[in-house]
Curated annotation (Swiss-Prot):
GO biological process, one term: arginyl-tRNA aminoacylation
Protein name: Arginine--tRNA ligase
Keywords tagged on the record: Aminoacyl-tRNA synthetase, ATP-binding, Cytoplasm, Ligase, Nucleotide-binding, Protein biosynthesis
Subunit structure comment from the entry: Monomer.
GO cellular component: cytoplasm
Top-level taxonomy: Bacteria, Pseudomonadati, Pseudomonadota, Alphaproteobacteria, Rickettsiales
Reaction catalyzed: tRNA(Arg) + L-arginine + ATP = L-arginyl-tRNA(Arg) + AMP + diphosphate
Molecular functions per Gene Ontology: arginine-tRNA ligase activity; ATP binding
Amino acid sequence: MNIFNQLKQDIIVASRQLYNNQEIANTATIEIPKDSFNGDLSSNIAMIIAAKESIAPREVALKFKEVLITLPYIASIEIAGPGFINFTIKADSWQASIKDILQHEEKFFEIDIDKSKNINIEYVSANPTGPMHIGHARGAIYGDVLARILQKVSYSVTKEYYVNDAGSQINDLVSTVLLRYKEALGEQITIPAGLYPGEYLIPLGQILAKEYGNKLLTMNYAERFKIIKSFAVEKMLDLNRKDLADLGIKHDIFFSEQSLHDKGEIEETVKLLERMGLIYEGTLPAPKGKIHEEWDNRVQKLFKSTKYGDSQDRPIEKADGSWSYFASDLAYAKDKIERGANHLIYVLGADHSGYVKRIEAIVKALGKEQVKVDVKICQLVNFVENGVPVKMSKRLGSFASVQDVNHEVGKDIIRFMMLTRQNDKPLDFDLVKVKEQSRENPIFYVQYAHVRTISILSKAKELMPESYNNFESGKYDLSLLSSEEEIEIIKLLASWTKTLEASAKYFEPHRIAFYLINLASKFHSMWNFGKENSDYRFVIESNKELTLARLALASAIQKVIASGLEVIGVEPMNKM
């Protein structure tokens, strides 16, 4: 029995019985109180009903208490504050969740929230002009883990990378590769400021020289540009794909910005918005304060972005008449919606925080308020060693590439550590602590818990083979798991799917990492109690019945930790 789901269903039934209202009860929450003094679970149903029916919340809460106290798994109910209903659950109901994890594993870990949602999540979208830096990695991992979580709760999810292969940065890439090509032909070159001086483009010049000889130099500009651009963008994308693959990340779609231009989708989108009355000719307001020299006060085509909450309307054309980057964003959102997405998620870096309102405006307009949009910002990553900031130019190269850091610490450590802070908060990545075997290193602490549970089961199989066979046959008495420490762990295990649902609801993958750290901490504490008091040991040869129950507990911990690590794309370790 999933206690959280069961209580929610019983509250819905009670709401229908007491107030003939099931629909509003669906919006009620079942939460774990921050203070255990307030019981095991808490619901706000009384306050929701009270607001709807214009009744005092405590009066509503008391009526719910009369009905719900009769449920066989409820030990007690208390009314707190303005009308929160706090529930204490009977121990045997918590203990039964261990059996659900072990004997009905597939059903316990299965979550089905809403299969009608078709989510498109765009993340990384780094310019294809060079190796990915570690700042990209945070957004990449956040987006990838969020996609995994959303898939885990049964949403249909498309993972997308928007390839910025149109615009000035691509022109600069082509110019740089052309110079490297000339260099490969024996010409002395100088890379001008503003281009890409990195040595990673040298092999591209060499490949072109080998394939074309000096033929590219005799071609007209347009033909040469087309060849070099196609070649360079594809090679840079291959590099980015490898960087991502090394982090365990694979997108479903790499969508080309250039394709929007080539297929006329930008023109089509602008015409649609004109028919909707959302494009007009006007001037942008002057920046606040003194007049800026860069302010463009010409009459131009503008999108009515302010109608949808943006701070200003947005230009869709540049001064030279070409489409603006914003115009590409309009066409790209339209394309996603036409492909069937009804919820768009954009994962952006800290340097794009100013794009949030304009992207929301785009989707609200093109989705006609029927398509949901969320824009998530990933803040910066600061590298430290034992808490002391590291200058990346001296430590891991000029821009701390993903390859550098991956080589230094490994994929699993990077993935886990990127989730140890909420995405919109800066993250300190300690290059020393992440390799320590101590509780100060969260990924080690969690992996060590997984290894220990396997060690417990192996030890029992070796020392008590008959008892171990009984455990595998499901012959254990879970009522023996009655200590405060055991019940605390069991409650946490039972809340795993609740944590997963919350992570999906609020787009917060860090909740998974926090949960695993908390579970590992409680398990290690109980393990350490066993060093001081033999009654707390998991394998007690003189007490077969208690050992059987604790083997069930250890196995449940192992399965939940493995499930959590799998969700965030980290491979559980079986030995250290």
